[in-house]
A protein has these predicted regions:
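Second-shell loop/turn segments in exported
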Residues: 94, 125-130, 154-161, 200-209
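Structured segments of extracytoplasmic/periplasmic soluble domains
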Residues: 26, 48, 96, 107, ...
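Glycine-rich anion/phosphate-binding loops
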Residues: 132-135, 158-172
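Functionally critical loop-and-helix segments that line ligand-binding/catalytic clefts
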Residues: 14-105, 246-279
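Sec-dependent signal peptide cleavage junction
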Residues: 1-14
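N-terminal carbohydrate-binding/catalytic regions of secreted carbohydrate-active enzymes
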Residues: 67-151
Length: 279
């Protein structure tokens, strides 16, 4: 008998004729690197994953974890901003269909998770059309049944106040009838394409003032429906691309900063310290 030789899929196995299974194998083997893809290959991968605008980001996250095993856990120690000295830290997670359709929410609750932000949908970064997260209804229902408080987020690509208001209405319509007690979040981030930042939001190059008006329009529209509006963005975007201090006067901010120390100095209420984790 000839022994089988272990085979690891790599980036050379990805082309414009690859199947979703081909791409996923490269990810599972920890060898996915979006910087090695050309524009047509990236477009093909987006199509394989139903044009979800978070595809490249999520595949890279999964691959990086599979390659290193570096993952955030509740037991790790993280240093919060000194502005929270004396505060009680409450732990939560954020999920989408990228986390699968069989989350055991009772185990999530038992692991010490008090709340979850659940993706309900978003806007495609190219066409500007909306999409719905296929797992949001079950995630909301099952999280609530397990005693996990729920907030939601919408992947935004709004470039005007009118678009922001429309996104807010779309989001609140989707969650009507559910007991949403945590914020309704505008996920304000740039898309990845051709090895760099892209998409209608990034390409609009909004001024800090214009971006601030867009964000406030979303939050105000959400607030008018009885929810708390909130903005999610990376520390860099919060610092460089919006008037965060002005936003913080009226609405909470969720800081995405992936390290063991929260260094954002502007007032904020939530800190996402990792983009991969388990409970």
């Amino acid at each position: 008998n000839v022994p089988e030789t272990a085979y690891a899929a790599n980036m050379s196995d990805i082309s414009v004729t690859s199947t979703r299974e081909d791409v996923q194998q490269v990810v599972d083997d920890g060898n996915f690197d979006y910087t090695e893809l050309d524009g047509t290959e990236i477009d093909h991968i987006y199509e394989l994953y139903n044009n979800d605008p978070e595809t490249i980001k999520q595949l890279q996250r999964q691959s990086d974890y599979n390659a290193t095993g570096d993952i955030a856990t509740l037991s790790a120690r993280y240093t919060h901003s000194s502005m929270f000295d004396g505060y009680k830290v409450i732990k939560g997670i954020d999920v989408s269909e990228w986390n699968g359709d069989n989350i055991n929410w009772k185990k999530v609750k038992a692991a010490g998770i008090s709340y979850a932000f659940i993706r309900v949908g978003g806007r495609y970064y190219g066409s500007g059309k909306y999409f719905i997260d296929s797992t949001y209804k079950d995630n909301i229902k099952n999280a609530l049944n397990a005693g996990v408080d729920v907030g939601v987020y919408f992947y935004s690509q709004a470039i005007s106040t009118s678009e922001a208001k429309t996104e807010a209405k779309y989001t609140t319509d989707l969650i009507s009838g559910y007991n949403i007690t945590y914020p309704v979040v505008m996920d304000y981030e740039y898309a990845w394409e051709d090895g760099g930042l892209s998409g209608r939001l990034y390409n609009a190059h909004l001024s800090k003032s214009a971006a601030t008006h867009v964000i406030k329009a979303f939050c105000a529209a959400v607030e008018s429906k009885g929810y708390v509006g909130m903005i999610y963005a990376s520390k860099t975007v919060i610092t460089d691309d919006m008037n965060a201090s002005s936003i913080a006067q009226s609405y909470p901010i969720w800081n995405a900063q992936y390290n063991d120390t929260d260094t954002l100095t502007v007032k904020h209420s939530y800190w996402q310290y990792s983009d991969v984790g388990k409970v």
